[in-house]
């Protein structure tokens, strides 16, 4: 048994070694081709020949790869002649191996190994103890078989060998002669340049060899014979004396690159020849002869395909090479527009399975709605024993929309899944339209639970129908008329059965469930005559750019044609697969016929002395890379092209620099010495706004501006919805007709788009005559990167940009420093994988009148923080998407994102329409829709990227000009997000080399010219700004800001501005007439901040803040002005003022919202109504508004407003004051204590004197700071007792004001009281207080005296440093807000030897009695 196993192992080893000796796909070797005349004889072998252009090599080479057969080395099957000019295939295994051709074949080696191995085993077996083993004869047989096999395999059968021959040459190499003698197989020859090419596949054997030639260039002779089909595509004849002889037993397809001029003789069964050739048939031979393009016999074409078909194409010379010839210039052919329709057809809005969610009290699952049996149908399944009511809820919010008092139609076809019975009988159905906040979210909700309780829908309509058949669908069609406009709503169809289901599942099949907007006559509505009530939104000039056709670049008389062989140094027009460098010093003109419009050009370089100029004629140009050191011209400022020219960029995703070093791949790179100019027809305006609202089902819209848009072009109608990213209501439409400012679409609108007086949806043109676009490969589009001057106008960029690869953006000025005449005007970017228009390390560039739609990452992008003095004007950015998970985070904190492969610029988690790292640029007349923010001003402490070593502070620069900009539908990802967001922090980490982006609150100090010097501070200024449908309209975390002339509509909050902040000349409108607005959110006009700011509101009209009885509290309700009451550690000082405030459709109860909480933020809330325009207290005179605490009831003018939960008083000679008690161990300086109210409470402070007898007090906590009314007595009582030492910062006791402070102490206490000013001064403010004669003497004194009456210590707190200088307050519009500064303090040190303080430093057990009311 053991010997049999050995024999089996031995035999299998033999077979394995034999099979390995004939394995395929093995590189046999390479040969360098050194001669320009070369012959290959492969007549005895099957070959697959590939001729390839390879610019990675400098000399031609030939490689041979085994496909099938026994060859293991090229020495086995070919020989090269001594003169290196020919190569012959054959069986050379029996030849004697020379010293220069040392080869031991794999087969011979295998044979040697196997025979040696066999001998050893055989010897061992024969010498074993059992000489009679019957296995020995079998072993001999196996051994003989193996030896025979390997002897047989040692001899190659060349006829059974198949190889691939790859001939690779650099693109500039030209053969004088290439001769191929072929056996069976195939040949594909691409890009060959030769004087003579001969391919013989006929004479040596009868085996078939197919031949395909693509884009070859021949200057003398082409001779091909094949028994199979011959295909020649785009052959280029580079002289006027070329002989072509083609012979085939099958078909011949001959395609010329630029025509053929010469004679021909064709013998074929079937001939197709284009009209450029004159033919006649020889009556004797039947051969067709003639000439093409009037040519002579200098060039001759002979084709023999007697049994086959011959096609000769593109024989016409469409591209003459005469330098004076020009292609016909493209005309400005504007498609005629039909008349605008006067009646609108019906429009159906069908609900399919994936549009709906099943909701009920219970009994729901993800199988409640499944696919139906026919188109537009679905099955509703009811499990056992469930209640009789359920909803089918639409996932499509806001489509369709319905006008009040207009008739609409709803239809549904129903078939029961089982015969009608008591468990599946449908009693009725109802159309419900819900406010989104009143129903489970059908899109993002995690539950299907819904129970109709006390919810009041926007509209409901109940109907009965034919719901009884289980054999066929029964149609129910009803009409309904809404009583209210229905915009942002969630539609639910309630199906109400007569009872619970039984023990079995029942089903209902529904088909063609739809709303129908009925046909109507189109009547032009009343159109807007201005776009804003208050702000002035500038518009670009109505003039078109002046044109002068005589200056067009293609008319120059010193141009040479791309398609002229003499243009090129080697006399050969380069093939697309080659690396092409334009000849030095030449201006090369490309016409449509100059190039292949289907082949992909690999790489084109324009040297510094050369120019590549395109004709103004329609063409498609497929290319991978273009590198421009000279000039790339496709139109100029004064010669815009009318033709449709399309450049399509190709290439797989790579990080390699295939254009040139640092320029990446798949696009155009323009060096610092280069210049690019692309100018297509000017469409103006590139975007406009609606002049009337457009409804679901509308075909016709009305716009505000004259435009020259065209039938067939695409436009986008921008959303009128808040949460743009969650519910895309931007609609791309095609123009069917256009007349003046009226546009008709080919399809109806699905959504409502608002065009009211408050604001209007934008409409933007997407189509352009010249386009750059990409073959879509893994979000790896083309890009244009310009380091020199670049001018672009009227260019469309589609599917461009390379996701998460820096510097690979659709259109990009890169490290250009200060440019002189560069701009991007009236261009469009759509469906971008990475940004829109980028300015990087470049100044003095203009981006104007451009459009961008559907973009990932920041759109208009200033990259490193050094970009200044650029103009960004009259542009549109819409539907901008954060990359990855959008930044969120609690409150003001935000989140930190770190640079990674999936988020190369971490700030893209908060992608914006306009990303402005340095504010010293002109931002004028733009609009932004969507995105995390519309306009983002991140904080950069220093530049990033290529400019990390530049010494500047980008965030220190203020706005150069920010004028007339609008934004909407953004800010909703972050609780304090805003459409204009001045916040977040972007830093470069020197340790790990990565960017870090923190999306939250960061302070920002801005200075004149960015020079950080005290006294040089200037505000960021935002003029004539309109923000709507936003979270916070403007969010500014900086220190200096002015917002002047501002409209806020439908924002959750109009603005959140900090530091020295002025909001003036504004309309703050809580609710517009836009039915698509966010009705599911409460809104507040403005929230006063809670500490260390100076806020002035002036000349503001608050409108349409309507009470919501379901609000959580007064701050959550729809109020015009609200407090900030969330915490104890931050104490409001006298920091908030207002003047000239008015209200429209705001009930008095909704003017102020103050939430009563046990926090210092709530207790100390206050503001000054400078002219009583808010309170109506004493018109023209200032009023003081204080919180709910009696502490603010400082005189008899004070009244408590229960709606506001605030006191309203005449201000008189009072001001808001703030002092900060520092008591070691109780109230520590600079320590923030977060704890419960009970643990924070350390005592109280009360008003006294001025006739006050009752307690008017508030709580004092462990967090420093007490705010109240100045020129009043303040009595401090601490539960721990009065301290032996305390310091009092006079943080805000303004000039001319004081606080008369009283504290209880035990009798016989003595005091040392001092004042201290922490800064140096020529005047001594450090005093030791003297003992006065009475409390009255202290109060009437200068603030350097004290008095102790045996019960109370009296000190008058006066900030002795103040003089009333304007530097002590912030003033705008005649309104002052005083500084809060901890620089002047008063310290009190108490000593009592009779009743000493306890060890913790307090005098205990003191009575709590108010000082005299007569003081």
UniProtKB/Swiss-Prot annotation:
Cited InterPro entries: CEMIP_beta-hel_dom, G8_domain, G8_domain-comF-like
Family: Belongs to the comF family.
Signal peptide: 1-24
Keywords, alphabetical: Glycoprotein, Membrane, Repeat, Signal, Transmembrane, Transmembrane helix
TM annotation in the entry: 107-127, 138-158
Localization in the cell: Membrane
PbH1 repeats: 819-841, 842-864
Residue positions the entry lists as glycosylated: 245, 366, 428, 466, 579, 844, 985, 1009, 1023, 1099, 1244, 1342
Keyword Endoplasmic reticulum appears in the UniProt entry: no
Organism: Dictyostelium discoideum (Social amoeba)
One Pfam family cited in the UniProt record for this chain: G8
One GO term describing the cellular component: membrane
Name under which the protein is recorded: G8 domain-containing protein DDB_G0278975
Keyword Magnesium: no
The G8 domain, residue ranges: 566-692
SMART domains hit by this protein: G8
Membrane topology of this protein: Multi-pass membrane protein
């Amino acid at each position: 048994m053991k010997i049999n196993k050995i024999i089996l192992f031995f035999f299998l080893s033999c077979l394995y070694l034999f099979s390995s000796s004939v394995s395929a796909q093995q590189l046999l070797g390479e040969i360098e081709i050194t001669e320009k005349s070369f012959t290959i004889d492969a007549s005895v072998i099957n070959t697959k020949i590939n001729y390839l252009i390879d610019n990675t090599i400098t000399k031609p080479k030939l490689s041979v790869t085994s496909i099938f057969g026994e060859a293991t080395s090229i020495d086995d099957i070919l020989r090269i002649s001594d003169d290196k000019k020919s190569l012959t295939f054959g069986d050379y295994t029996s030849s004697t191996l020379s010293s220069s051709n040392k080869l031991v074949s794999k087969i011979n080696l295998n044979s040697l190994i196997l025979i040696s191995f066999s001998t050893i085993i055989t010897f061992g077996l024969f010498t074993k103890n059992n000489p009679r083993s019957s296995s020995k004869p079998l072993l001999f047989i196996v051994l003989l078989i193996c030896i025979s096999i390997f002897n047989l395999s040692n001899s190659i059968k060349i006829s059974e060998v198949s190889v691939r021959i790859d001939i690779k040459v650099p693109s500039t190499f030209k053969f004088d002669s290439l001769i191929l003698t072929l056996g069976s197989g195939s040949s594909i020859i691409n890009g060959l340049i030769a004087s003579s090419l001969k391919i013989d596949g006929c004479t040596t054997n009868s085996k078939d060899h197919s031949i395909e030639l693509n884009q070859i260039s021949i200057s003398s002779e082409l001779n091909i014979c094949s028994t199979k089909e011959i295909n020649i595509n785009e052959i280029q004849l580079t002289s006027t004396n070329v002989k072509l002889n083609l012979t085939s037993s099958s078909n011949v397809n001959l395609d010329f690159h630029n025509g053929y001029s010469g004679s021909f003789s064709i013998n074929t069964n079937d001939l197709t020849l284009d009209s450029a050739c004159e033919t006649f048939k020889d009556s004797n031979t039947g051969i067709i002869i003639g000439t093409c393009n009037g040519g002579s016999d200098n060039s001759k074409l002979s084709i023999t395909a007697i049994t086959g078909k011959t096609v000769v194409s593109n024989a016409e010379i469409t591209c003459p090479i005469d330098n004076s010839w020009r292609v016909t210039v493209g005309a400005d052919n504007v498609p005629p527009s039909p008349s605008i329709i006067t009646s609108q057809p019906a429009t159906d809005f069908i609900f399919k399975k994936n549009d709906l969610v099943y909701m009920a009290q219970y009994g729901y699952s993800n199988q409640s709605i499944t696919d139906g049996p026919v188109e537009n149908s679905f099955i509703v399944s009811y499990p056992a024993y469930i209640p009789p009511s359920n909803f089918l809820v639409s996932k499509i919010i806001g489509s369709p929309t319905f006008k009040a008092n207009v008739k609409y139609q709803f239809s549904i076809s129903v078939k029961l899944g089982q015969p009608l019975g008591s468990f599946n009988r449908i009693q009725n159905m109802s159309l419900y339209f819900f406010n989104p906040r009143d129903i489970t979210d059908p899109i993002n909700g995690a539950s299907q639970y819904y129970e109709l309780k006390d919810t009041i829908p926007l509209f409901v309509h109940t109907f009965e129908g034919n719901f009884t058949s289980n054999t066929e669908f029964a149609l129910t069609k009803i009409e309904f008329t809404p009583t209210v406009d229905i915009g942002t709503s969630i539609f639910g169809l309630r199906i109400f059965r007569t009872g619970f289901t039984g023990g079995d599942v029942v089903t209902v099949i529904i088909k063609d469930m739809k709303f129908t907007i009925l046909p109507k006559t189109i009547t032009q509505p009343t159109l807007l005559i201005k776009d804003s009530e208050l702000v002035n939104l500038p518009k670009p000039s109505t003039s078109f750019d002046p044109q002068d056709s005589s200056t067009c670049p293609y008319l120059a008389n010193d141009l040479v044609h791309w398609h002229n062989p003499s243009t090129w140094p080697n006399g050969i027009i380069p093939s697309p697969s080659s690396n092409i460098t334009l000849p030095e010093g030449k201006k090369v003109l490309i016409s449509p016929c100059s190039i292949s419009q289907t082949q992909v050009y690999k790489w084109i370089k324009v040297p510094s002395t050369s120019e590549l100029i395109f004709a103004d004629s329609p063409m498609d140009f497929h290319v991978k890379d273009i590198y421009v050191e000279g000039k790339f011209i496709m139109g100029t400022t004064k010669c815009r092209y009318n033709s449709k020219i399309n450049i399509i960029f190709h290439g797989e995703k790579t990080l390699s620099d295939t254009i040139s070093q640092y320029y990446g791949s798949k696009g155009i790179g323009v060096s610092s010495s280069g210049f690019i100019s692309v100018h297509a027809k000017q469409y103006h305006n590139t975007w406009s706004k609606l002049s009337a609202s457009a409804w679901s089902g509308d075909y016709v819209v009305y716009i505000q501006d004259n435009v020259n848009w065209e039938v067939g072009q695409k436009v986008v109608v921008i959303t009128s919805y808040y949460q743009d990213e969650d519910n895309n209501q931007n609609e791309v439409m095609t123009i069917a007709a256009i007349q003046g400012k009226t546009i008709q679409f080919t399809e109806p609108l699905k959504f409502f788009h608002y065009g009211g007086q408050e604001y209007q949806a934008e409409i933007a043109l997407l189509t352009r005559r010249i386009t750059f676009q990409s073959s879509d490969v893994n979000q790896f589009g083309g890009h244009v990167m310009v380091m020199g001057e670049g001018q672009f106008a009227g260019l469309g960029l589609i599917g461009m940009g390379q996701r998460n690869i820096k510097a690979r953006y659709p259109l990009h000025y890169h490290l250009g420093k200060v440019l002189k005449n560069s701009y991007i005007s009236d261009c469009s970017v759509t469906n971008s994988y990475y940004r829109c228009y980028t300015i990087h390390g470049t100044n003095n560039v203009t981006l104007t009148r451009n459009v961008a739609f559907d973009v990932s990452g920041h759109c208009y992008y200033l990259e490193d923080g050094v970009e200044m003095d650029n103009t960004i004007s009259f542009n549109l950015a819409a539907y901008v998407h954060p990359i990855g998970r959008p930044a969120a985070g609690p409150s003001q904190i935000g989140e930190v994102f770190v640079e990674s492969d999936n988020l190369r610029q971490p700030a893209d988690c908060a992608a914006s329409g306009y990303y402005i790292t340095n504010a010293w640029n002109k931002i004028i007349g733009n609009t932004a829709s969507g995105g995390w923010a519309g306009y983002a001003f991140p904080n950069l402490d220093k530049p990033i990227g290529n400019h990390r070593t530049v010494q500047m502070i980008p965030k220190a620069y203020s706005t150069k000009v920010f004028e007339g900009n609008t934004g909407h539908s953004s800010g909703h990802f972050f609780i304090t997000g805003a459409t204009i967001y001045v916040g977040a922090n972007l830093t470069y980490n020197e340790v790990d080399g990565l960017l870090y982006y923190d999306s939250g609150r960061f302070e920002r100090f801005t200075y004149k010219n960015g020079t950080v010097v005290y006294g040089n501070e200037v505000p960021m200024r935002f003029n004539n700004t309109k923000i709507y449908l936003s979270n916070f309209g403007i969010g500014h975390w900086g220190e200096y800001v002015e917002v002047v002339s501002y409209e806020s509509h439908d924002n959750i909050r109009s603005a959140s501005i900090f530091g020295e902040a002025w909001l003036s000349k504004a309309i703050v409108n809580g609710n517009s007439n836009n039915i698509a607005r966010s009705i599911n959110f409460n809104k507040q006009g403005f929230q006063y901040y809670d500490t260390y700011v100076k806020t002035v509101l002036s000349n503001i009209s608050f409108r349409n803040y309507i009470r919501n009885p379901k609000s959580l509290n007064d701050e959550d309700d729809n109020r015009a002005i609200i407090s900030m009451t969330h915490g104890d550690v931050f104490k409001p000082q006298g920091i908030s003022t207002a003047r000239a405030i008015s209200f429209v459709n705001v009930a008095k109860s909704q003017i102020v919202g103050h939430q009563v909480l046990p926090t210092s933020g709530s207790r100390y809330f206050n503001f000054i109504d400078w002219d009583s325009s808010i309170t109506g207290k004493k018109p023209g005179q200032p009023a003081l508004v204080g919180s709910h605490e009696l502490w603010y009831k400082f005189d008899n003018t004070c009244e408590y407003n229960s709606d506001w939960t605030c006191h309203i008083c005449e201000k008189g000679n009072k001001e808001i004051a703030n002092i900060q008690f520092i008591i070691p161990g109780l109230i520590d300086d600079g320590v923030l204590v977060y704890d419960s109210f009970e643990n924070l409470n350390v005592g109280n402070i009360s008003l006294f004197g001025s006739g006050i007898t009752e307690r008017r007090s508030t709580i004092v906590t462990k967090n420093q700071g007490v705010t109240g009314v100045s020129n009043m007595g303040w009595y401090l009582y601490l539960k721990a007792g009065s301290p032996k030492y305390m310091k009092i910062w006079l943080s805000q006791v303004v000039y001319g004001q004081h606080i008369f402070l009283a504290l209880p102490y035990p009798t016989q206490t003595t005091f040392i009281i001092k004042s201290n000013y922490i800064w140096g001064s020529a005047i001594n403010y450090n005093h030791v207080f003297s003992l006065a004669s009475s409390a009255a003497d202290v109060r009437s004194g200068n603030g350097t005296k004290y008095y102790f009456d045996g019960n109370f210590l009296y000190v008058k707190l006066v900030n002795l440093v103040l003089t009333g200088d304007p530097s002590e307050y912030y003033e705008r519009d005649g309104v002052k807000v005083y500084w809060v500064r901890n620089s002047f303090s008063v310290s009190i040190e108490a000593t009592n030897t009779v009743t000493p303080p306890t060890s913790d430093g307090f005098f205990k057990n003191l009575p709590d009695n108010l000082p005299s009311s007569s003081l």
